[in-house]
A protein has these predicted regions:
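Transmembrane beta-strands of outer-membrane beta-barrel pores
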Residues: 5, 28-36, 133-141, 189-195, ...
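Residues on the lipid-exposed face of transmembrane beta-strands in outer-membrane beta-barrel proteins
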Residues: 11-15, 112-118, 173-177, 225, ...
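Flexible glycine-rich, low-complexity coil/linker segments exposed to the extracellular/periplasmic environment
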Residues: 1, 40-101, 266-290, 373
Length: 377
């Protein structure tokens, strides 16, 4: 089972202004998130009565499965039969491998911001947008358990509590220039962050020993993960034709200060988990999300939308949308001893496609909508 609770409070206000800035917004936001996962497991065993005939009140009769070549087979109330004739006692701690499947992650994020909205002109060109700053404080923690094979029976399940706190100052500038003729140029400059996945912050550790080599290994989450951080530059051009048709081109550049990737570190000290196990050494492979530092991400995107009714009324309601993106990345792996590293050289960002394209044909009319899409990456 998974329980994910999010609570939030936001207080904000605005002050009208005259001149280049039309309004000043001030606010503070409190976000509290708690995610808890439990995955108890167990075997279903025959009860003390042993093998027996299922009672008539639990039988449904025969079902014809001739279409599958199985003929007629009996059917019954399976949940009822399990409850009456079998035992099932799921647990999170009955085996060492189950312990790492339960964890709790908590995040407390406080964000204060100030934003000045722009609705003015630069020369004869109308410009809209905003400039502002956010100050964000994050307190993240995780609680889980691990199996200590050296402890006395009944005391082998031990807690893990870990986490970190950090503060980010995030300035941003966003501008949109109206060039006339339904043309817009957008410009953005900002320091950005992206939070880690909640499951990546789990403190749980799954430990095991290779029976052939005696080498230990472990994997889990990392409650001390920093977010993705980047200095970002975005610029785009948009041209509209009527209400729905448009073409656009956008380019972006991100100077990555930190990123997150799954890494396997060799010769990792696992002495905390090896006592009582069959391991012949305390050092093995540990796999978990880690932060990398330094790199770039850049690219461009082309997009177009064309309602075919603009060509001929016979195709009214039909349309086509297309887009293509082209990406380049370059990161430096933090730990040269990791199996995902190439020494001091750079690698591409794992999981990022160099080229992605989308093509969609659609029909929209009278409240009815149908789409056929293709995506390549």
């Amino acid at each position: 089972s998974v329980e994910d609770i999010l609570k939030g409070v936001k207080i904000s206000g605005s002050i009208p202004m005259d001149g280049f800035f039309s309004e000043l917004e001030l606010g503070i936001n409190f976000a509290d998130r708690s995610k808890e996962k439990h995955q108890p497991e167990g075997n279903i065993n025959v009860g003390i009565q042993g093998d027996t005939t299922i009672a008539p009140d639990l039988q449904y009769g025969n079902v014809n499965l001739g279409f599958a070549g199985l003929g007629s087979i009996p059917s019954w109330n399976v949940p009822g039969a399990v409850a009456r004739y079998m035992t099932f006692d799921p647990s999170e701690t009955s085996a060492g491998y189950l312990i790492a499947k339960a964890w709790t992650v908590k995040e407390k994020i406080t964000t204060a911001y100030a934003k000045a909205n722009i609705d003015s002109q630069v020369g004869s060109i109308p410009v809209r947008g905003n400039v502002g700053v956010q100050v964000q404080n994050t307190d993240q923690s995780s609680q889980a358990n691990y199996f200590d094979g050296s402890a006395a029976p009944g005391k082998q399940v031990k807690p893990i509590n870990d986490g970190t706190t950090y503060t980010d100052v995030l300035p941003a500038l966003n501008l949109a220039f109206n060039l006339g003729g339904d043309q817009t140029v957008r410009f953005g400059l900002a320091q950005q962050i992206a939070r880690p996945k909640v499951a990546d912050l789990a403190a749980s550790v799954d430990f095991g020993v290779d029976n052939t080599t005696g080498k230990p290994g472990a994997g889990g989450g990392n409650p001390k993960l920093d977010p993705w951080r980047a200095n970002a530059l975005d610029i785009s051009y948009e041209k509209y034709f009527g209400n729905k048709a448009y073409v656009s081109a956008a380019a972006f550049y991100k100077d990555l200060k930190s990123y997150i990737y799954k890494q396997s570190r060799d010769n990792y000290d696992l002495s905390k988990y090896t006592p009582g196990s069959t391991a012949t050494t305390n050092f093995g492979t540990f796999s978990a999300p880690f932060n990398g530092a330094g790199g770039t991400l850049s690219g461009m995107e082309l997009a177009a939308s064309l309602p075919l009714g603009m060509i001929t009324s016979a195709l009214s309601g039909f349309g086509v949308q297309a887009s293509a993106s082209f990406n380049n990345s370059n990161i430096a792996v933090k730990d040269p001893d990791s199996s995902s590293s190439v020494g001091s050289g750079a690698i591409e960002l794992p999981g990022l496609s160099k080229t992605t394209s989308n093509l969609t044909f659609y029909y929209e009319a009278g409240g009815f909508e149908a789409r056929i899409s293709q995506r390549n990456r």
